[in-house]
Amino acid sequence: MIAVYPGSFDPITLGHLDVIERGCKLFETVVVAVSKNPNKIPLFTVEQRIQQIRTCTLHLANVEIDAFHGLTVSYAKMRQAQVLLRGLRAVSDFEYELQMAHTNKSLYPQIETVFLTTANEYSFLSSSQVKEIARFGGSVAHLVPANVAIDLEKCFAQTPTVSTPIAQD
């Protein structure tokens, strides 16, 4: 059975990696599908994100990494996937994901959505939070794979890390 795990992964976090690793135990193949979202300005290019994911999933024999644009369900159909794999951090994630699952099912009746709840230690984690912490010089080593922490450090090396008040006239 093929599962597609879609996302922007900008950057991939340990929460994402946890879902990938657990998905690999459940499915014959897990396709990590990096989306090219025209509504978001990414920190890393699609190629960089693919390389980051490839590096931190080398230990998983049944992972494929790919990129796509357009509807996730259309991509899943093209890949002949039976499952969309989604991670849930909180009830608020479930409300959104449930709506998406119903919409995807209406577009492609053969697709099922499987939700994996994140491990407790990652229930608060998001790529946006990781970027914010890294941007201001905080350590993200406990939030992302080691290769991604290095990439983030390089990316924000020129950003001032001290919080300072903004002078008002």
UniProtKB/Swiss-Prot annotation:
Q: Does the keyword Magnesium apply?
A: yes
Specify whether Magnesium is a keyword of the entry. Answer: yes
Disulfide bonds, paired cysteine numbers: none
Q: What Gene Ontology cellular-component terms does the record carry?
A: cytoplasm
Pfam families from the xrefs?
A: CTP_transf_like (PF01467)
What cofactor does its activity depend on?
Answer: Mg(2+)
Where does this one sit in the cell?
Answer: Cytoplasm
Looking at the UniProt record, the site noted as Transition state stabilizer sits at 16
State which Enzyme Commission number(s) the record gives. 2.7.7.3
UniProt lists the family membership as follows: Belongs to the bacterial CoaD family.
**Name of the protein this chain belongs to:** Phosphopantetheine adenylyltransferase
Q: Which organism is it from?
A: Cyanothece sp. (strain PCC 7425 / ATCC 29141)
